Amino acid sequence: MTQETQQLTLALSKGRIFEETLPLLEAAGIKVTEDPETSRKLILQTNDANVRVIIVRASDVPTYVQYGAADFGVAGKDVLLEHGGEGLYQPIDLNIANCRMSVAVKDGFDYESAVQQGARLRVVTKYVQTAREHFAAKGVHVDLIKLYGSMELGPLVGLADAIVDLVSTGSTLRANHLVEVERIMDISSRLVVNKAALKLKRERLQPILEAFEKASKRSS
Protein backbone atom coordinates (compact mmCIF):
# COMPACT_ATOMS: atom_id res chain seq x y z
CA MET A 1 0.00 0.00 0.00
CA THR A 2 1.19 3.51 -0.73
CA GLN A 3 1.70 6.19 1.91
CA GLU A 4 -1.47 7.92 0.68
CA THR A 5 -3.67 4.83 0.97
CA GLN A 6 -2.28 4.11 4.44
CA GLN A 7 -2.93 7.67 5.59
CA LEU A 8 -6.01 8.49 7.63
CA THR A 9 -7.89 11.68 6.82
CA LEU A 10 -9.95 13.43 9.50
CA ALA A 11 -12.53 16.04 8.43
CA LEU A 12 -13.08 18.94 10.83
CA SER A 13 -14.67 22.37 10.65
CA LYS A 14 -13.06 25.52 12.01
CA GLY A 15 -14.09 27.02 15.30
CA ARG A 16 -15.54 25.36 18.36
CA ILE A 17 -15.59 21.80 17.03
CA PHE A 18 -11.95 22.02 15.94
CA GLU A 19 -10.85 23.46 19.29
CA GLU A 20 -12.77 20.90 21.33
CA THR A 21 -11.56 17.99 19.18
CA LEU A 22 -7.87 18.84 19.79
CA PRO A 23 -7.77 17.31 23.32
CA LEU A 24 -9.37 14.14 21.96
CA LEU A 25 -6.72 13.91 19.26
CA GLU A 26 -4.00 14.49 21.84
CA ALA A 27 -5.43 11.64 23.91
CA ALA A 28 -4.73 9.47 20.86
CA GLY A 29 -1.19 10.88 20.64
CA ILE A 30 -1.98 13.09 17.66
CA LYS A 31 -1.16 16.80 17.55
CA VAL A 32 -2.15 19.12 14.72
CA THR A 33 0.92 21.14 13.76
CA GLU A 34 -0.91 24.16 12.29
CA ASP A 35 -3.76 26.42 13.38
CA PRO A 36 -6.56 26.71 10.78
CA GLU A 37 -7.45 30.16 12.11
CA THR A 38 -4.05 31.54 11.07
CA SER A 39 -3.14 29.20 8.22
CA ARG A 40 -4.75 29.38 4.78
CA LYS A 41 -4.07 25.69 4.24
CA LEU A 42 -7.06 23.37 4.03
CA ILE A 43 -4.98 20.22 4.58
CA LEU A 44 -3.14 20.23 7.90
CA GLN A 45 -0.44 17.78 8.87
CA THR A 46 -0.03 16.26 12.32
CA ASN A 47 2.86 14.82 14.30
CA ASP A 48 1.77 11.43 12.93
CA ALA A 49 2.76 11.12 9.27
CA ASN A 50 -0.17 8.74 8.75
CA VAL A 51 -2.86 11.16 9.97
CA ARG A 52 -3.87 14.43 8.33
CA VAL A 53 -6.73 16.86 8.95
CA ILE A 54 -8.82 18.53 6.26
CA ILE A 55 -10.72 21.72 7.05
CA VAL A 56 -14.21 21.88 5.52
CA ARG A 57 -17.53 23.60 6.19
CA ALA A 58 -19.37 22.05 9.12
CA SER A 59 -22.29 21.05 6.89
CA ASP A 60 -19.92 19.31 4.47
CA VAL A 61 -18.18 17.02 6.97
CA PRO A 62 -20.68 14.11 6.57
CA THR A 63 -20.43 14.32 2.77
CA TYR A 64 -16.63 14.10 2.77
CA VAL A 65 -16.82 11.08 5.08
CA GLN A 66 -19.73 9.42 3.24
CA TYR A 67 -17.88 9.44 -0.09
CA GLY A 68 -14.53 8.41 1.37
CA ALA A 69 -12.66 11.68 0.83
CA ALA A 70 -12.20 11.56 4.61
CA ASP A 71 -12.02 8.39 6.66
CA PHE A 72 -13.61 9.94 9.72
CA GLY A 73 -14.83 13.30 10.95
CA VAL A 74 -16.56 15.21 13.71
CA ALA A 75 -20.00 16.71 13.05
CA GLY A 76 -22.83 18.13 15.11
CA LYS A 77 -26.03 16.18 15.56
CA ASP A 78 -27.80 19.07 13.81
CA VAL A 79 -25.69 18.58 10.68
CA LEU A 80 -26.08 14.81 10.73
CA LEU A 81 -29.87 15.03 11.00
CA GLU A 82 -30.01 17.27 7.94
CA HIS A 83 -27.58 15.04 6.04
CA GLY A 84 -29.46 11.85 6.89
CA GLY A 85 -26.41 9.83 7.95
CA GLU A 86 -26.31 7.65 4.85
CA GLY A 87 -23.06 5.67 4.49
CA LEU A 88 -21.84 6.74 7.93
CA TYR A 89 -21.05 4.82 11.08
CA GLN A 90 -21.66 6.96 14.16
CA PRO A 91 -19.97 5.12 17.03
CA ILE A 92 -19.41 7.86 19.59
CA ASP A 93 -21.19 10.91 20.97
CA LEU A 94 -18.12 12.97 21.83
CA ASN A 95 -20.03 15.26 24.19
CA ILE A 96 -18.37 18.37 22.75
CA ALA A 97 -19.73 21.59 21.23
CA ASN A 98 -22.87 21.16 23.32
CA CYS A 99 -25.83 23.43 22.68
CA ARG A 100 -29.53 23.11 21.89
CA MET A 101 -31.79 23.58 18.90
CA SER A 102 -34.69 25.87 19.73
CA VAL A 103 -37.55 27.93 18.39
CA ALA A 104 -37.24 31.66 19.07
CA VAL A 105 -39.48 34.62 18.30
CA LYS A 106 -39.39 38.39 18.59
CA ASP A 107 -39.93 39.58 22.14
CA GLY A 108 -43.66 40.32 22.50
CA PHE A 109 -44.87 37.81 19.88
CA ASP A 110 -47.36 35.40 21.51
CA TYR A 111 -46.13 32.14 20.05
CA GLU A 112 -48.33 29.89 22.20
CA SER A 113 -51.51 31.73 21.22
CA ALA A 114 -50.58 31.66 17.54
CA VAL A 115 -50.02 27.90 17.71
CA GLN A 116 -53.24 27.26 19.65
CA GLN A 117 -55.24 29.31 17.16
CA GLY A 118 -53.83 27.26 14.28
CA ALA A 119 -52.07 30.21 12.68
CA ARG A 120 -49.71 29.45 9.80
CA LEU A 121 -46.28 30.61 10.87
CA ARG A 122 -43.36 31.58 8.71
CA VAL A 123 -40.09 30.18 10.06
CA VAL A 124 -36.51 30.80 8.92
CA THR A 125 -33.88 28.17 9.57
CA LYS A 126 -30.82 26.40 8.26
CA TYR A 127 -32.28 23.13 9.54
CA VAL A 128 -35.27 22.68 7.26
CA GLN A 129 -35.63 18.90 7.57
CA THR A 130 -35.42 18.87 11.37
CA ALA A 131 -37.76 21.87 11.69
CA ARG A 132 -40.29 20.29 9.32
CA GLU A 133 -40.38 17.09 11.36
CA HIS A 134 -40.65 18.98 14.65
CA PHE A 135 -43.58 21.17 13.62
CA ALA A 136 -45.35 18.31 11.83
CA ALA A 137 -45.17 16.20 15.00
CA LYS A 138 -46.77 19.06 16.96
CA GLY A 139 -49.39 19.77 14.30
CA VAL A 140 -48.14 23.32 13.77
CA HIS A 141 -48.65 24.79 10.30
CA VAL A 142 -45.48 26.44 9.01
CA ASP A 143 -43.87 27.79 5.87
CA LEU A 144 -40.13 27.16 6.10
CA ILE A 145 -37.59 29.51 4.56
CA LYS A 146 -33.99 28.32 4.34
CA LEU A 147 -31.29 30.80 5.30
CA TYR A 148 -27.58 30.18 5.79
CA GLY A 149 -26.85 32.73 8.49
CA SER A 150 -28.13 35.65 10.59
CA MET A 151 -31.38 33.85 11.44
CA GLU A 152 -32.08 36.42 14.15
CA LEU A 153 -32.67 39.05 11.49
CA GLY A 154 -35.73 37.24 10.09
CA PRO A 155 -38.31 38.23 12.73
CA LEU A 156 -36.81 41.72 13.11
CA VAL A 157 -37.41 42.71 9.48
CA GLY A 158 -40.70 40.90 8.96
CA LEU A 159 -39.33 37.98 6.98
CA ALA A 160 -40.55 35.44 9.53
CA ASP A 161 -42.52 34.94 12.73
CA ALA A 162 -39.96 32.59 14.23
CA ILE A 163 -36.55 31.03 13.82
CA VAL A 164 -35.18 27.56 14.45
CA ASP A 165 -31.50 27.77 15.32
CA LEU A 166 -28.80 26.57 17.66
CA VAL A 167 -28.60 28.29 21.04
CA SER A 168 -25.67 28.13 23.40
CA THR A 169 -25.81 30.92 25.97
CA GLY A 170 -28.75 32.81 24.45
CA SER A 171 -26.77 36.06 24.38
CA THR A 172 -27.22 36.53 20.61
CA LEU A 173 -30.98 36.11 20.96
CA ARG A 174 -31.14 38.63 23.80
CA ALA A 175 -28.97 41.13 21.91
CA ASN A 176 -31.49 41.00 19.06
CA HIS A 177 -34.60 41.12 21.28
CA LEU A 178 -35.60 37.53 20.61
CA VAL A 179 -36.82 35.00 23.17
CA GLU A 180 -36.52 31.23 23.21
CA VAL A 181 -40.00 29.69 23.28
CA GLU A 182 -39.42 26.02 22.56
CA ARG A 183 -36.51 23.62 22.98
CA ILE A 184 -36.45 21.07 20.15
CA MET A 185 -33.46 18.96 21.18
CA ASP A 186 -30.04 18.97 22.78
CA ILE A 187 -27.14 18.98 20.33
CA SER A 188 -23.62 17.63 20.67
CA SER A 189 -20.95 16.59 18.21
CA ARG A 190 -20.37 13.01 17.15
CA LEU A 191 -17.60 11.02 15.58
CA VAL A 192 -18.57 9.73 12.14
CA VAL A 193 -16.64 7.07 10.24
CA ASN A 194 -16.74 5.96 6.62
CA LYS A 195 -18.08 2.39 6.63
CA ALA A 196 -15.59 1.15 4.03
CA ALA A 197 -12.67 2.74 5.90
CA LEU A 198 -13.78 1.02 9.09
CA LYS A 199 -13.30 -2.32 7.35
CA LEU A 200 -10.20 -1.56 5.29
CA LYS A 201 -8.33 0.58 7.82
CA ARG A 202 -9.66 -0.85 11.06
CA GLU A 203 -6.21 -1.59 12.45
CA ARG A 204 -5.23 2.09 12.23
CA LEU A 205 -8.64 3.54 13.06
CA GLN A 206 -9.56 1.42 16.07
CA PRO A 207 -6.94 2.79 18.52
CA ILE A 208 -7.97 6.36 17.64
CA LEU A 209 -11.66 5.59 18.08
CA GLU A 210 -10.98 3.97 21.45
CA ALA A 211 -8.88 6.94 22.61
CA PHE A 212 -11.64 9.34 21.52
CA GLU A 213 -14.24 7.34 23.41
CA LYS A 214 -12.20 7.21 26.63
CA ALA A 215 -11.37 10.93 26.47
CA SER A 216 -14.98 11.92 25.77
CA LYS A 217 -16.19 9.89 28.75
CA ARG A 218 -13.66 11.59 31.02
CA SER A 219 -14.84 15.03 29.92
CA SER A 220 -18.56 14.26 30.26
From Swiss-Prot:
Keywords from the UniProt entry: Amino-acid biosynthesis, ATP-binding, Cytoplasm, Glycosyltransferase, Histidine biosynthesis, Nucleotide-binding, Transferase
Keyword Glycosyltransferase among record annotations: yes
Reactions this protein catalyses: 1-(5-phospho-beta-D-ribosyl)-ATP + diphosphate = 5-phospho-alpha-D-ribose 1-diphosphate + ATP
EC number: 2.4.2.17
Pathway this chain belongs to: Amino-acid biosynthesis; L-histidine biosynthesis; L-histidine from 5-phospho-alpha-D-ribose 1-diphosphate: step 1/9
GO MF term list: ATP binding; ATP phosphoribosyltransferase activity
ATP-binding listed as a keyword: yes
Species the sequence originates in: Janthinobacterium sp. (strain Marseille)
Pfam families the record matches: HisG
Subcellular compartments: Cytoplasm
Xref: CDD domains: PBP2_HisGs
Known function: Catalyzes the condensation of ATP and 5-phosphoribose 1-diphosphate to form N'-(5'-phosphoribosyl)-ATP (PR-ATP). Has a crucial role in the pathway because the rate of histidine biosynthesis seems to be controlled primarily by regulation of HisG enzymatic activity.
GO biological process, one term: L-histidine biosynthetic process
Taxonomic classification: Bacteria, Pseudomonadati, Pseudomonadota, Betaproteobacteria, Burkholderiales
Top-rank taxon, per record: Bacteria
Protein name: ATP phosphoribosyltransferase
